[in-house]
Amino acid sequence: MCGRFQLDVNDSEFRSIFKSLNYTPTNSVSESGDFTPSLLLPSLCLNRNGKIAVKALKWGLSAPSGKGLLINARSETVFTKPFFRSDFENRRCLIPAHGFYEWDAEKKKILFKRYDGAMFFLGGIFRRLETDDKCLILTRSARPPVSAVHDREPIMLEIKQARAWLTNTDAAKEYA
């Protein structure tokens, strides 16, 4: 599960990528630090013209039962479950991050990040709603070192995988 992640919008890599897409942080999107469910996240997605664009997405979607907030979806089943299938096929997104947190058995928060500290993307899906566009982060079975702490981890993508994740459903299935 991924319930909190870290992003530094002052990072030169973040600024370079997002500036090239004409993005300027606004008051509506949380600026930096730890991001938690219900916050607006700066995200990459395809616009209606099929171009990569920056979009503010609210993290979390009401559960089908109407009770609770879904913040993650299992990558193994997201393209087969009716509740998620259309979102996976048509509305994938990328959420920039510098790290994510998991909690160990003693409820101690542990930060996982790249060894070089570079930015990466969390793979997600989003849904257009009347009020806000909402997103979920996709997870998979954890691999070391995360598996020592938790059984799930977010889908993590390198910058070079971004375009394929957003534009190619078959490639996205492979990454998931």
Give the label of every model feature segment.
Residues 1-176:
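Short linear sequence motif anchored by a di-proline
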